[in-house]
Amino acid sequence: MDLELQDFYNKTLATENNTAATRNSDFPVWDDYKSSVDDLQYFLIGLYTFVSLLGFMGNLLILMALMRKRNQKTMVNFLIGNLAFSDILVVLFCSPFTLTSVLLDQWMFGKVMCHIMPFLQCVSVLVSTLILISIAIVRYHMIKHPISNNLTANHGYFLIATVWTLGFAICSPLPVFHSLVELQETFDSALLSSRYLCVESWPSDSYRIAFTISLLLVQYILPLVCLTVSHTSVCRSISCGLSNKENKLEENEMINLTLQPFKKSGPQVKLSSSHKWSYSFIRKHRRRYSKKTACVLPAPARPPQENHSRMLPENFGSVRSQHSSSSKFIPGVPTCFEVKPEENSDVHDMRVNRSIMRIKKRSRSVFYRLTILILVFAVSWMPLHLFHVVTDFNDNLISNRHFKLVYCICHLLGMMSCCLNPILYGFLNNGIKADLISLIQCLHMS
């Protein structure tokens, strides 16, 4: 986290190899490196304090909520808990030490901490980023293979151990290539006695540039690509499943229209008062019948047709009498009967339509949530990595006076990700959200 700030001090110390005459005539004095941060130090202290407390408390609540239900933890929740722990380390290691070095223009934590603290800062940030990649990969695996999902706790432990091992391995050069430099010898000023700076001391600029590019690839480009690919695949899988259901519903509707076209083209019938009463009776007592039962109105009685009856054969009278006796209806009272599966298709289609609408709403919320995750990561970390690359390749683009102010702005944007991760991965997670609400209620009551 402090690599960009150390570039500023490395640039300050780069002229140390000049001749003594050049140093006495052209080397800038310490007052030339007075920063515009000095005019905003109280504002920066308040802003850093707010961001640090917000990130610490948010991630601590996530950890406490997940610790309460350790028996019901899943792979994603296990990774979210480790993400909250690494973000707490980022807040503890990066915020106070960086702000102190910026405001005091010196390193006041000793030689041992000069070797340890940059290493811990880099490891905590890198582990947090690698856990984001792990969460994206696990979600992709759960969507693509929902039935054969055999991720156990041992897989989670192995994944976390791999993440921390990679973090320690990638950041291992930092303790070696850091040193404590005394400002009095550098600037030849008695006013700077007993003041030190913790700076990088690489064998050559090529080593420093190679390390900068490797961090850019591992901490920003690779996570951004993994998040984009994984979340895009998740959204596509959800949309494909939704389109399959819609296509099946449309196919069923086409089959119904083909087999029973008369249902859509029947004339409108005006209901009488008795029929209206029957419909109100059905609506009033529909809860008394099961879902497979329906109520219909009796067929209106037809006037006797003497001419038609005369044309019928003689033996048809018995059949007609049996039919009339078995189909007697009480006038004005609906008849209830069991609906056949093919007659219940309209109710089924209505339920499918409602489920499709719910899935559409849920898929839109998932799409917005995943898009916000990608944008938050890209926007929060891009300025800091871009600042690091620019200052490594051309350290004269930013003036000495505004160097630390620009760095503080980029650093605060990176710290904002530690504040937003609990919201995006915890408070917007329905399972964790319920645990958080119960935890907050318990804390409020106590």
Curated annotation (Swiss-Prot):
One of its GO terms (biological process) is cardiac left ventricle morphogenesis. A lipid is attached at residue 442 (S-palmitoyl cysteine). Glycans are attached at residues 10, 17. Gene3D superfamilies: Rhodopsin 7-helix transmembrane proteins. GO terms for molecular function: neuropeptide binding; pancreatic polypeptide receptor activity; peptide YY receptor activity. It comes from the Eukaryota. InterPro entries: GPCR_Rhodpsn, GPCR_Rhodpsn_7TM, NPY5_rcpt, NPY_rcpt. It is found in: Cell membrane. The keyword Lipoprotein applies. Its main location: membrane. It is a multi-pass membrane protein. Residues 1-42, 99-117, 178-208, 391-407 are extracellular. The chain crosses the membrane at residues 43-63, 78-98, 118-138, 157-177, 209-229, 370-390, 408-428. Disulfide bonds join 114-198. Signal peptide: none annotated. Keywords: Cell membrane, Disulfide bond, G-protein coupled receptor, Glycoprotein, Lipoprotein, Membrane, Palmitate, Receptor, Transducer, Transmembrane, Transmembrane helix. Residues 64-77, 139-156, 230-369, 429-446 are cytoplasmic. One of its GO terms (cellular component) is neuron projection. Receptor for neuropeptide Y and peptide YY. The activity of this receptor is mediated by G proteins that inhibit adenylate cyclase activity. Seems to be associated with food intake. Could be involved in feeding disorders. Belongs to the G-protein coupled receptor 1 family. PANTHER family: NEUROPEPTIDE Y RECEPTOR, NEUROPEPTIDE Y RECEPTOR TYPE 5. This is Neuropeptide Y receptor type 5. The gene is NPY5R.
